[in-house]
């Protein structure tokens, strides 16, 4: 997703290897986030996982010891059981919802974990142009 972390490259492997040798440094985990696992086309996710495995292998070859590896989000847990590692980060599926209509819903039978119920407490008419809500968000 390009948010944080290192690029998949030999230079990154060298940098991480140097960092791992610093005093008082313990590499706890390495992770990625399957950016498109919830889409019908799974090619991006397969390619992303291959890059992840390449980095893992290169770091291990360089003697970098990492305790935990993690790729899975909700869609990854559902659609990619063969790509699991040490940890998984279930997001929306914790609440019993599928991440999209493009995942294999028959693979995991999710049950809603909560329900949002609301009641109308007050109705009033206001003149056009009246500022409503925090910061006058609505007019």
Predicted regions and their residues:
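Active-site loop/helix belt of alpha/beta enzymes
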Residues: 1-119, 123-127
